[in-house]
């Protein structure tokens, strides 16, 4: 078969299927999504998979944790010898620079984690013997993915390391430090890691910059920014953790973060407030339009139904009302739940 394999958060398969269908139609490539709710992945079947993958950049996909081009689908694998049919299916392929053996991040997929680990150890030497895998990982070469959907059912796929998630399953393994004020700190950590390139992080998040955190309490996002030595105005009627204030980089204003505005322009504004997504999109657009900040990261809490439609509406609303030339990226992060995280950067 030919198509794209994209991983997603369990339960968001319809949103990813709708996104892939809409984006493929926009670039003029015909295809259809194959998925079931709670699978943790979507197959977008099309004849021009490589061309579609080139047009749909991983960083631009909202609900996809990972983006892969399918090479083959193997069913009825013999548990005693899965390697032989995989080698046969890969015959004629160029050499790969790495191998990741995976499973969907779903209730049905997680029990396959042990198989994925052990099979990867068995498959690597066989691939090297066949001339299909380098001795050491080489990022400049395509990366081979084997995704087990069941013990006898696997998808073989390939990734461009420069246009795919650099983590197995598309999940960055971030550790919640004991001093983090809340688990929400992981969301901003992941947003900075996922939505910005390494070069952008170095250029746009510098010591001495000034930021506002709207709806800051108890201080998770503020704490993440202070670890980058950014000066933060934390706006919330609720309290911040004492050790966050003790950094000397934080000014706590007891005010309504949704209506507060700064006295002078800031480098960054971040916001993780529980509010209707369209209201948030409009308020964030006001911040950009009025020049109150150059860059922003904010969350949009999605409704239970028509989440892809609401996502498109909110992003369109934000860009229209911002009235600025922006680079906008959005992702449903691993540490997000019923929400997406949006980055907007001025040039």
Swiss-Prot record:
HAMAP family attached to this UniProt entry: 23SrRNA_methyltr_M
Organism: Xanthomonas campestris pv. campestris (strain B100)
Gene designation per UniProt: rlmM
Keyword presence, Amino-acid biosynthesis: no
Source domain of life: Bacteria
SUPFAM superfamilies referenced in this protein's UniProt entry, alphabetically: S-adenosyl-L-methionine-dependent methyltransferases
Subunit: Monomer.
EC number, as in UniProt: 2.1.1.186
Primary enzyme class: transferase
Entry keywords, A to Z: Cytoplasm, Methyltransferase, rRNA processing, S-adenosyl-L-methionine, Transferase
Example of a GO biological process term: rRNA processing
Catalytic activity: cytidine(2498) in 23S rRNA + S-adenosyl-L-methionine = 2'-O-methylcytidine(2498) in 23S rRNA + S-adenosyl-L-homocysteine + H(+)
Protein's job: Catalyzes the 2'-O-methylation at nucleotide C2498 in 23S rRNA.
Pfam families assigned to the protein according to its UniProt record, in alphabetical order: FtsJ, RlmM_FDX, RLMM_N
UniProt protein name: Ribosomal RNA large subunit methyltransferase M
Recorded GO MF terms: S-adenosylmethionine-dependent methyltransferase activity
UniProt KW Glycosyltransferase keyword: no
Family, per entry: Belongs to the class I-like SAM-binding methyltransferase superfamily. RNA methyltransferase RlmE family. RlmM subfamily.
Active-site residues (renumbered): 301 (proton acceptor)
One term under GO cellular component: cytoplasm
Subcellular localization, as worded in the UniProt entry: Cytoplasm
InterPro entries named in the record: RlmM_FDX, RlmM_THUMP-like, RNA_MeTrfase_FtsJ_dom, rRNA_MeTrfase_M, SAM-dependent_MTases_sf
